[in-house]
UniProtKB/Swiss-Prot annotation:
Gene Ontology CC annotation, any one: mitochondrial inner membrane
Organism of origin: Dictyostelium discoideum
The entry's keywords: Disulfide bond, Electron transport, Membrane, Mitochondrion, Mitochondrion inner membrane, Repeat, Respiratory chain, Transport
PANTHER family in UniProt: NADH DEHYDROGENASE [UBIQUINONE] 1 ALPHA SUBCOMPLEX SUBUNIT 8 (PTHR13344:SF0), NADH-UBIQUINONE OXIDOREDUCTASE (PTHR13344)
Keyword Repeat applies: yes
UniProt KW Transport keyword: yes
Subunit structure: Complex I is composed of about 45 different subunits.
Name of this protein: NADH dehydrogenase [ubiquinone] 1 alpha subcomplex subunit 8
InterPro entries xrefs: Ig-like_dom_sf, NDUFA8
Motif extent (Cx9C motif 3): 63-73
Disulfide bonds: C20-C51, C30-C41, C63-C94, C73-C84
Length: 104
């Protein structure tokens, strides 16, 4: 399993949520219904990791340049994304064009 920095996760969050939102919601629902024992929601947790990893691999494969620019800006601004609108816009456009269609 690949590992990502905090800034990479922040930069990718909207794209990952757009594709994996239903999986995330199923996991949260399970946690609310069954409590905090991780084994009770293992299937849902595995689905979250699997979906997220698939999306992030496609982002790295297709939008690496835009991701790097967004991450650099986020890191330079103490993990704040507001000053990085231009970089985030370029990343989101790449995601919408090259990554999202693979999951529709």
């Amino acid at each position: 399993m690949e590992s990502f920095t905090r800034a990479e996760l922040v930069a990718q969050r909207d794209g990952v949520w757009a594709v994996c939102g239903e999986v995330f919601e199923a996991y949260e629902k399970c946690r609310m219904e069954k409590g905090s024992d991780p084994e009770l929601c293992l299937r849902e947790s595995t689905a979250v990791v699997g979906c997220s990893q698939k999306v992030m691999r496609e982002i790295v494969k297709n939008c690496q340049k835009e991701l790097n620019e967004s991450v650099k800006c986020i890191e330079e601004n103490n993990m704040r994304t507001i000053p990085c609108e231009e970089e985030n816009k370029a990343f989101n456009e790449c995601f919408d064009k090259l990554v999202a269609p693979k999951f529709l």
